[in-house]
Design a protein with these regions (language model features):
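Transmembrane helix-loop junctions and nearby membrane-interface residues
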Residues: 62, 81-88, 109-116, 137-140, ...
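Membrane-water interface of alpha-helical transmembrane segments
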Residues: 67-70, 91, 95-98, 119, ...
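Alpha-helical transmembrane segments and their membrane-interface exit regions
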Residues: 75-84, 105-106, 128-137, 210-213, ...
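Membrane-interface helix-loop-helix junctions at boundaries between adjacent transmembrane segments
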Residues: 86, 90-102, 107-191, 195
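C-terminal transmembrane-bundle signature of multipass membrane proteins
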Residues: 210-324
Length: 324
């Protein structure tokens, strides 16, 4: 397959080569190199301090005052997303920023800033974040590594939304002064399970947003990137999945119609977690247990990763001792 570049030269469209590797900083601008050498490296040196500080602020405000928590959330959320954008720009991973999870996070920011009383925005945000986005913690194998900025950012993107919507949805159970929030934050106290308009919105909103996202994702991946042959920045979740054995077992040859197959797998995942969103929305106890499960999974998964790293260090030390 060929295309005509902007200079009128006929070129071959690059294929998705699983062995393709690049130097991510090769050809970067002076600004990018300066930011990486003088800012990012110094920020990484204090990852543990930053992460513990931010978690303590969010945990304290969440447990005491919902208003204060939403203010802290906006500050932390904005910082996390902007910092991730800078890192992905430097690493040439910008394609990750068009994933479905980021739509849910942007929607949460919109709810927090402009639509705390808008039922439709609340239902959209809740149904998206309490299902597919939060369960991506398991699907993407997230772990709470306080020494790694990228891992921590992924944890925040997948868990902050579900924790926030849990607090907003069940504030009448969680806060003694919840009456103060009436009129300023959406009132959800009287929502009960029944097949009504609210139920249908919780059921369908994630799919409406998914369709919009899928169309945009498909166009960007199959048209824009392919047209200009941006193979060196083709770094997205699809690149992770198409290399996996599970992907090949389900959909066959990963070099054919990769984007469509990835979207199909994404849709299957969304269909599978839809009942989870409904259970979370209508049951306080289920929602609470689910949130605890997500947090425990992050901690447990990190303990497994830490154990593996320790075993590697021990094996290297044993080999070194044997040589001596």
């Amino acid at each position: 397959m060929e295309y005509i570049d902007k200079n009128g030269i006929k070129r071959k469209v690059p294929t998705l080569d699983p062995n393709f590797k690049i130097d991510r900083f090769e050809g970067q601008s002076k600004l990018a190199k300066y930011i990486n050498n003088n800012f990012i490296s110094k920020m990484d040196a204090f990852t543990s301090v930053r992460s513990v500080f931010l978690v303590l602020i969010l945990a304290f405000t969440l447990g005491n005052n919902l208003y204060h928590y939403l203010i802290a959330l906006f500050i932390v959320h904005t910082y996390v997303l902007v910092y991730r954008g800078i890192r992905f720009w430097l690493e040439r991973w910008l394609m990750y920023l068009i994933e479905y999870c980021y739509i849910g996070n942007i929607l949460l920011i919109h709810f927090n800033l402009f639509a705390r009383n808008n039922m439709n925005i609340f239902l959209s945000t809740y149904s998206m974040t309490s299902g597919i986005i939060s369960l991506a913690v398991v699907a993407c194998d997230n772990h709470a590594d306080i020494t790694d900025t990228d891992f921590l950012t992924s944890c925040c993107i997948h868990t902050l939304p579900v924790a926030t919507m849990w607090a907003v949805r069940w504030k009448h159970y969680l806060y003694d002064n919840y009456l103060e929030y009436k009129g300023n934050i959406i009132d959800t106290e009287n929502i009960k399970f029944q097949i009504d308009e609210t139920f249908l919105k919780v059921l369908t909103y994630p799919f409406i947003y998914w369709i919009v996202w899928a169309v945009i994702y498909f166009i960007i991946n199959t048209k824009t990137l392919r047209k200009y042959a941006y193979s060196d920045i083709y770094q997205s979740t699809i690149g992770d999945f198409y290399k996996s054995k599970d992907f090949e077992c389900l959909f066959g040859d990963h070099t054919k119609n990769t984007v469509i197959k990835y979207l199909m797998m994404h849709l299957i995942f969304l269909l599978g977690v839809t009942p989870l969103s409904l259970l979370n929305f209508y049951s306080f106890y289920f929602n609470t247990i689910y949130l605890i499960f997500i947090l425990l999974f992050l901690g447990y998964n990190q303990s497994i990763k830490s154990k593996e790293e320790i075993n590697k260090i021990v094996k290297k030390a044993e080999k070194f001792d044997k040589k001596d």
